[in-house]
Swiss-Prot record:
This protein's name: Uncharacterized lipoprotein SAR2457
Membrane topology (UniProt): Lipid-anchor
Record's keyword annotation contains Transcription: no
Major subcellular location class: membrane
Species: Staphylococcus aureus (strain MRSA252)
Protein location: Cell membrane
Keyword Ligase carried by entry: no
Keyword terms, alphabetized: Cell membrane, Lipoprotein, Membrane, Palmitate, Signal
GO cellular component annotations of the record: plasma membrane
């Protein structure tokens, strides 16, 4: 009887020990599973963070490329505008140049003498040279005449009347020579020269014929 009781007790202890080992094994396996899940979750979190960082870096690169492209577009547009402005300026200059040339041609006045002109300038400075060559070097006749008249009016009577002109040549350089009659004094003239630069100068304000 004692042996039976002792056997049952030993069996109970063995089963209890086996159950405890099984529980410990389960706990150990559970801890391993939990640890593996935690590591997997941490890895996913790290991978997700890395993906977000990579996406952010990619986004920065895309934004940088967009900015670079925008800067290039702006530079190209600026260069295009500058080219168009230069072309427009060139066209305007050519147009103005053509207009000036046309105005000069249309305002050209051939040399002439005054009404009932006496041979005064022609007598003082007779010219026998190449008139066409001289006129090519000299300024516009009407412009030179106006400048000479203004200069003559600075001396004595301020309303002198144009009489005649001639051309003087010296070492290949030419000058207009104008005579202006003083309407208040019979036979009195002012002699004025205008050189190839357009500079007017009175050489004799009281020439008497």
């Amino acid at each position: 009887m004692k042996k039976l009781v002792t056997g049952l007790l030993a069996l109970s202890l063995f089963l209890a020990a086996c159950g405890q080992d099984s529980d410990q094994q389960k706990d150990s396996n559970k801890e391993k599973d939990d640890k593996a899940k935690t590591e997997q979750q941490d890895k996913k979190t790290n991978d997700s963070s890395k993906d977000k960082k990579d996406n952010k870096d990619d986004s920065k690169d895309v934004n940088k490329d967009n900015k670079d492209n925008s800067a290039n577009d702006n530079q190209q547009q600026s260069n295009s505008n500058a080219t168009n402005n230069d072309q427009n300026q060139t066209n305007n200059n050519q147009s103005n140049s053509g207009q000036t040339t046309n105005n000069q041609k249309s305002s050209y006045v051939a040399p002439y003498y005054g009404q009932n002109a006496a041979p005064v300038a022609r007598q003082i400075y007779p010219f026998n040279g190449n008139k066409s060559q001289a006129l090519q070097q000299l300024p516009n006749f009407q412009t030179a005449l106006n400048a000479a008249n203004n200069e003559a009016n600075k001396f004595g009577n301020g309303h002198k009347v144009y009489n005649d002109y001639s051309i003087e040549e010296h070492n290949g350089n030419y000058k207009y020579v104008f005579s202006f009659k003083d309407p208040n004094v019979n036979g009195k003239y002012s002699i004025v020269t205008v050189d190839y630069t357009g500079q007017a100068m009175v050489t004799d304000p009281n020439y008497q014929q």
